[in-house]
UniProtKB/Swiss-Prot annotation:
Database matches in PANTHER family: ATP SYNTHASE DELTA CHAIN
Keywords, ordered alphabetically: ATP synthesis, Cell inner membrane, Cell membrane, CF(1), Hydrogen ion transport, Ion transport, Membrane, Transport
Organism, as annotated: Photorhabdus laumondii subsp. laumondii (strain DSM 15139 / CIP 105565 / TT01)
Function text: F(1)F(0) ATP synthase produces ATP from ADP in the presence of a proton or sodium gradient. F-type ATPases consist of two structural domains, F(1) containing the extramembraneous catalytic core and F(0) containing the membrane proton channel, linked together by a central stalk and a peripheral stalk. During catalysis, ATP synthesis in the catalytic domain of F(1) is coupled via a rotary mechanism of the central stalk subunits to proton translocation.
Record keyword Phosphoprotein present: no
Main location: membrane
UniProt name for this protein: ATP synthase subunit delta
């Protein structure tokens, strides 16, 4: 968990509540994603870690973001800058995404395989995970040759390792103990 998890929670909740009220969840998520990416820039990170006055810092950050942030987002940035929390924007984004997924009863499921899976295989995984989690799932597929064969499925804290690499690792652990 990020060092900013606790700090980011009230900001994520405030942004989420506002976005729900204004029916602009997608817009706010995109804005938060953009600002989070801006904070990851090395030079911007140094600027945010510096000793600029909060008003100057907010105005500079807003200028860097340009047209990507509307008036409401600018106010949000000003409040975060005033409290010295702009570096928490990546965590604010993550918590915003979780709140949105909870509202929409969806969960992101990461599927890792050695080769690209066919649509039929993905459909089976999707149905099985929806049944197990009692939520709609959004599959994010990745290819990782190190799994050798099979799949690894991750949804939050749940990890289902059906890969050959996982079996070999478990066998190694048993043989070593």
């Amino acid at each position: 968990m990020s060092e900013f998890a606790t700090v980011a929670r009230p900001y994520a909740k405030a942004a989420f509540d506002f976005a729900v009220e204004k029916q602009s969840l997608e817009q706010w998520q995109n804005m938060l994603a953009f600002t989070a990416e801006v904070t990851r820039n090395e030079q911007v990170g140094e600027l945010l870690s510096g000793s600029l006055a909060s008003e100057t810092l907010a105005n500079t950050f807003i200028a860097i973001c340009g047209e990507q942030v509307d008036e409401h987002a600018q106010n949000f940035i000003r409040v975060m800058a005033e409290n010295g929390r702009l570096l928490a924007l990546p965590e604010v984004l993550q918590q915003f995404i979780q709140l949105r997924a909870s509202l929409e009863s969806t969960v992101d499921v990461e599927v890792i395989s050695a080769t690209e899976l066919r649509e039929q295989q993905l459909a089976k995984i999707s149905v099985a995970m929806e049944k197990r989690l009692s939520r709609k799932v959004k599959l994010n597929c990745k290819i990782d040759k190190s799994v050798i064969a099979g799949v690894v499925v991750r949804a939050g804290d749940l990890v289902i390792d059906g890969s050959i690499r996982g079996r070999l690792d478990r066998l190694t652990d048993v043989l070593q103990s």
